[in-house]
């Protein structure tokens, strides 16, 4: 079966202990229910912790005896972490769990043209899995695919788009083919329109991770940020009263964006009280806006106040773009950022 395998990346780090309990229980309940939709889509903007949720639900299910097949896309490795690799990895894992499928997969893989993703899916997934009709729902593997929207990389060329469209086209079969409907598929991504077209909420379960103005004081998303920040600030050796005041100031500004909270914790770690005084954040409800404000504060604090305002804005824009892209960006991409404006500014950065 080795020839059938594809490249695979491990899932990211799980959620911190004690956080995301409400949403994890919701996902687990949907996975266990034979009557709910077979596709569970965890949706949210960058930085809210979708990948951590994918890792946590995998660990949680495996800890309760459920076999999980996981796969993670990464836009920086779009030439190897492909749709072809996804279905080959899943096929191989099914064979390890159900050796009787081996012959189906070996025969289906013969003469396969990697450009024909529909044939690959039918021969390695759709047809073989029909042999598992008699397996009880609670014993079937759960498939977890993280960062679905990163398939195809930045999609600057036709190959990236072709791979992404091939992925969506084959995934659509998951809700169309009767015998595939018994297999639970958990996916994570940003709320992209193309994915919504494939998986509208009429045929899939949408688990929306709130952010910005959707995060209210006292709700689970806000409390999760609070738990995370308290654990980080407590470890810095400062007095409890200061920790409480700092958390009360920071939590509303996070807007449910975990990458914001992580950046704050990293920034404060070396000199908490002094650096906290530099966090003159705007009172925005949108976590993404406060993230840019935070970057600006970090840059000013770390590099001194000799930078001009336009330079701070440009550096902040570049840092933000690379954070959300999760990879280095080339000059051609960065020059298009509105705050960079010129080659001279880009060279300065």
Residue positions per predicted region:
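Conserved NB-ARC/NACHT P-loop NTPase core of NLR-like innate immune receptors
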Residues: 1-349
């Amino acid at each position: 079966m080795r020839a059938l395998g594809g490249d695979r990346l491990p899932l990211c780090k799980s959620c911190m202990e004690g956080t995301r309990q409400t949403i994890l229980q919701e996902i687990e309940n949907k996975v266990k229910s034979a009557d709910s939709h077979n596709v569970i889509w965890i949706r949210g903007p960058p930085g809210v912790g979708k990948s951590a949720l994918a890792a946590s639900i995998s660990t949680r299910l495996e800890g309760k005896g459920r076999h999980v097949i996981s796969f993670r896309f990464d836009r920086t490795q779009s030439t190897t972490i492909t749709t072809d690799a996804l279905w080959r990895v899943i096929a191989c894992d099914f064979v390890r769990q159900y050796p009787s499928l081996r012959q189906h997969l070996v025969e289906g893989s013969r003469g396969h043209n990697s450009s024909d993703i529909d044939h690959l899916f039918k021969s390695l997934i759709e047809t073989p899995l029909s042999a598992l009709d008699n397996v009880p729902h609670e014993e079937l593997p759960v498939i977890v695919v993280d960062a679905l929207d990163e398939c195809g990389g930045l999609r600057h060329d036709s190959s990236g788009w072709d791979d992404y469209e091939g992925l969506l086209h084959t995934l659509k079969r998951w809700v169309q083919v009767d015998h595939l409907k018994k297999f639970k598929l958990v996916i994570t991504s940003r709320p992209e329109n193309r994915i919504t077209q494939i998986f509208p909420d009429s045929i899939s379960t949408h688990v929306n991770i709130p952010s910005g103005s959707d995060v209210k004081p006292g709700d689970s998303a806000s409390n999760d940020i609070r738990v995370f920040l308290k654990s980080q600030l407590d470890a810095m050796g400062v007095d409890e009263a200061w920790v409480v005041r700092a958390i009360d100031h920071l939590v509303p500004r996070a807007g449910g964006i975990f990458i914001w909270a992580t950046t704050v914790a990293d920034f404060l770690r070396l000199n908490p009280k002094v650096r906290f005084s530099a966090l003159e954040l705007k009172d925005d409800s949108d976590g993404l806006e406060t993230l840019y404000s935070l970057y600006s504060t970090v840059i000013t604090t770390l590099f001194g106040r000799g930078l001009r305002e336009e330079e701070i804005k440009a550096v902040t824009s570049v840092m933000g773009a690379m954070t959300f892209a999760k990879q280095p960006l080339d000059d051609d991409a960065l020059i298009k950022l509105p705050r960079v404006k010129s080659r001279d500014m880009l060279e300065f950065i």
